[in-house]
């Protein structure tokens, strides 16, 4: 029987119960894969990516022993979205002006004129 691929998708986070092999997702019920900001809405630094990756690892650890199901994947994705919002509000993360669509999905940019 083929393994089932579970996934959770938010605006900026995609989680899969899979591993990446040769650029393809291979279902793996023992591993979670994070796809961060697939639409390139933000400009990421190494530090901001590391912050989200660390938060992801912490969340996965905190859910150890719990069922790996849609509900728990959505909870992890929602927590990560909140972390992205915090980085944006702190000024550590900025919108990408070259993004395909500028929709300010997490609110208007924080600039001195708007504060």
Swiss-Prot record:
Q: What is its EC number?
A: 7.1.1.-
CC annotations in GO:
plasma membrane-derived thylakoid membrane
Catalysed conversion reaction: a plastoquinone + NADH + (n+1) H(+)(in) = a plastoquinol + NAD(+) + n H(+)(out); a plastoquinone + NADPH + (n+1) H(+)(in) = a plastoquinol + NADP(+) + n H(+)(out)
The Swiss-Prot or TrEMBL record describes its family as follows: Belongs to the complex I NdhM subunit family.
Q: How does it assemble?
A: NDH-1 can be composed of about 15 different subunits; different subcomplexes with different compositions have been identified which probably have different functions.
Q: What does this protein do?
A: NDH-1 shuttles electrons from an unknown electron donor, via FMN and iron-sulfur (Fe-S) centers, to quinones in the respiratory and/or the photosynthetic chain. The immediate electron acceptor for the enzyme in this species is believed to be plastoquinone. Couples the redox reaction to proton translocation, and thus conserves the redox energy in a proton gradient. Cyanobacterial NDH-1 also plays a role in inorganic carbon-concentration.
Supply the name of the protein: NAD(P)H-quinone oxidoreductase subunit M
Please tell me the species this chain comes from. Answer: Synechococcus sp. (strain WH7803)
């Amino acid at each position: 029987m083929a393994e089932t691929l579970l996934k959770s998708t938010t605006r900026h986070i995609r989680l899969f119960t899979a591993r990446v092999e040769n650029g393809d997702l291979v279902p793996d019920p023992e591993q979670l894969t994070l796809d961060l900001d697939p639409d390139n809405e933000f400009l990421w630094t190494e530090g901001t990516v590391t912050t989200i990756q660390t938060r992801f690892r912490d969340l996965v650890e905190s859910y150890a022993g719990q069922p790996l199901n849609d509900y728990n994947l959505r909870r992890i994705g929602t927590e990560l979205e909140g972390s992205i919002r915090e980085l944006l509000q702190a000024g550590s993360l900025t919108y990408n002006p070259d993004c395909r669509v500028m929709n300010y999905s997490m609110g208007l940019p924080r600039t001195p004129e708007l504060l």
